[in-house]
Each structure stands twice: as C-alpha cells, then as structure tokens.
Amino acid sequence: MAKAKFERNKPHCNIGTIGHVDHGKTSLTAAITKVLAEAGGATFTAYDQIDKAPEEKARGITISTSHVEYETPNRHYAHVDCPGHADYVKNMITGAAQMDGAILVVSAADGPMPQTREHILLARQVGVPAIVVFLNKCDMVDDPELLELVEMEVRELLSKYDFPGDDIPIIKGSALAVLENSDPKLGHDAVLELMKAVDAYIPQPERPVDQPFLMPVEDVFSISGRGTVVTGRVERGIVKVGEEIEIVGIRPTQKTTVTGVEMFRKLLDQGQAGDNIGALLRGTKREDVERGQVLCKPGSVKPHTKFKAEAYILTKEEGGRHTPFFTNYRPQFYFRTTDVTGVVHLPAGTEMVMPGDNVAMEVHLIVPIAMEEKLRFAIREGGRTVGAGVVASIIE
C-alpha cells in the first residue's frame, strides 16, 4: 500500500502520550490512528508496530521513540510515544521530540501512579505548555463514583504542579474498546472527543519564523574591505539587512547593524529560521565576537549565569560517568555552540547523583550565556557527553 502524502495545508502541532507504565499510552496511540484512519486522516498503526520503537540519538544520548502522524479536520499532528520510562525522561529533557502539548494517560482502574506524577513534574520542568487527560480502561470500572474519585485525584495532581487542574479536559474511555471493536461509546466516540479536546485546548505553537530573531554564532571571519562576517544557522525569526541587532553572551552585550546577509555565496535581503547564513556586521572587529555568543533582536534575550535545571545523567553503558557526583561538581555546560564551565548545586536532601538518575539542580556558570527557559544543553567532561538538561527557570 502506497503511503498517502500528507498535505501540509493545516497548522502543524507536536504532541505525545505520557503517563505510568501499562496505563495504555501505546494502545491509545494505536487507537487514535485507527479512529482517524476511518476519516482518511491517518494510517492505522497497530500496537506492536508502535511498541518496537526505533532507537535514535539526540545530544549523544540513545532514545527509543515511536513517531506516528495523523490529522484532524483542524490540524496535522506528529505524535511521539516511548516504550520505557527512561526513554520518556530522556526524551523530555533533551527535547528530542519537541512537545507542544501532551496527552496524559491514566488508568481508571489504578488511578495516578508514581510515573504519572513524575511525567507531570517533567512536563512542568521542561515547559510543555498544555496537557489533556485520557482516563483509560473505564470499561474495567463499574462504579461511577470511583471514576469521579480518580478524576479528582488527577486534577489535584495537575494543580500541584502548576497546571490548571480544574480546567484541563479529562476524557473517559477505553483504548482497547477501539482496538477490539467493542464498546463504541467508550472507544470510538471517546477518542473523537479526545481529539476534539486536543484540537481546542492545546494552543497552536508560534512558528519559529514568527518569533524574535536569534542566531547562535558558529564562526567569525574577517573579510578585507568588507568587515566582519558571523556565520550560523538562524534558530528563529527573521533578520533583514539594515536592522539593528545585539550580540549577547560571554562578554558585555553590544549593539551593531547587519549590513549584509549571505547564503550559498549569494546576497539576500533577509535570513530566516532554518537558514545557514553569514551576517556582515557594521563596525564590529573580528575579536569583538566569538563562538558561543548569539545575534538576536535587541532586548529579546538576556545573558545569565545562574539557573535551575532538570537534567538526566547518562549511565556507564550509555557512555556516561561510572561514578556518582556531588554538590560542587564542575563539568562543562554545552549551550548551542560552546562549552562553559559551571558549578552544580544539588537540592537539599539529595546527597549525590548516580549515573542514570534525573535530577533538579542549580547551576552557576563562570561566564554569562544568552538563555531563557526551555533552552536545552549537554553536560560534558572533556568533550564527552555525560548528561543532558533543560533550563527550568532563571535565577539571575
């Protein structure tokens, strides 16, 4: 069967299923593709197809993830599902599969469990903007009061981690009912209702090109008679010739003007998100700019040295450390294009961090870096990746 080509005429959104092991994340993913396939918006992907997730590398870390795509009348979705809990932790922290929203799957028969809590906390730490809940396995619960109790527990848990627990849509159903063609009300209808809620409740992400301009500096050249050219890939936004920009990070912030934009040796009047460009900077000397800084729209990003982060520390088998580390550990933090040394402070009550752990930590960098919440980084020792992290909040 030939794969139908998805027409990109609808807004695109990245989502994923999260929740405790065996609560039905993968079954729900399969059920969504089955229900939407009837309307021609997907190709049905069976449970065992999704379950044997291929391995991929992100920031030097191997993660297993399954990707399916489907569309509703309003949107096109890329949906990610992970086989194991460790894969979720790694995926959310590295941002390997960016999530604009998540479907939290909770088994009605069991209620919230430890990983339910951990995934909600991770979603908060890594900045997942919105969550919709699917209360699964409702066909296994006869008592409607019990369902209400589980729903209340889930709402309280979401509120505890600063999600709007009272407002979040909770859809009750059964993924198995879809896959076994049994109860259409709990199966087919519930999945359609879930997708309606996802369409309506998960906000449409702003496209990178509509965000304020930012380009990490990869290289700096001096071109005789023309000035200094800075190269890199535009991360977001648009830069036009003649616009004023700032150079942020490592040293005091400087202002300059872009007098030319080049791509593939051709002159352009602008560069935009995704382009690999060379930007000619007015009156800027070769030694004024270095790799690791960013060019950005004035005032849009500030340099910082202290932040709180959520990090995953690689196991020995993944090529990470063989031993734990303690407070005052001093690795390098690789942001965008460069390593900066930083000092780690562990939270009260955390004596040490073992390889394979994920941990909330505070980091003090020795020089300021252009950063904002949700920025990803690698933790390295002498060029070897030993962990991955994401900025949860900025201190100063």
Swiss-Prot record:
Give the CC-aspect GO terms: cytosol
Disulphide-bridged cysteine pairs: none
Task: Cite the GO molecular-function annotations of the record.
Answer: GTP binding; GTPase activity; guanosine tetraphosphate binding; translation elongation factor activity
Which keywords has UniProt assigned to this entry? Cytoplasm, Elongation factor, GTP-binding, Hydrolase, Magnesium, Metal-binding, Nucleotide-binding, Protein biosynthesis
In which residues is Mg(2+) bound? Answer: 26
Which coarse location class describes where this protein primarily resides? cytoplasm
Cellular location(s): Cytoplasm
Catalysed reactions listed for this entry: GTP + H2O = GDP + phosphate + H(+)
Mind telling me which CDD domains this protein's record contains?
EF_Tu, EFTU_II, EFTU_III
* Record domain tr-type G: where: 10-206
Q: What class of enzyme is it?
A: hydrolase
**Function of the molecule:** GTP hydrolase that promotes the GTP-dependent binding of aminoacyl-tRNA to the A-site of ribosomes during protein biosynthesis.
Q: Identify its protein family.
A: Belongs to the TRAFAC class translation factor GTPase superfamily. Classic translation factor GTPase family. EF-Tu/EF-1A subfamily.
Q: What is this protein called?
A: Elongation factor Tu
> Which species is this record about?
Nitrobacter hamburgensis (strain DSM 10229 / NCIMB 13809 / X14)
UniProt gene name: tuf
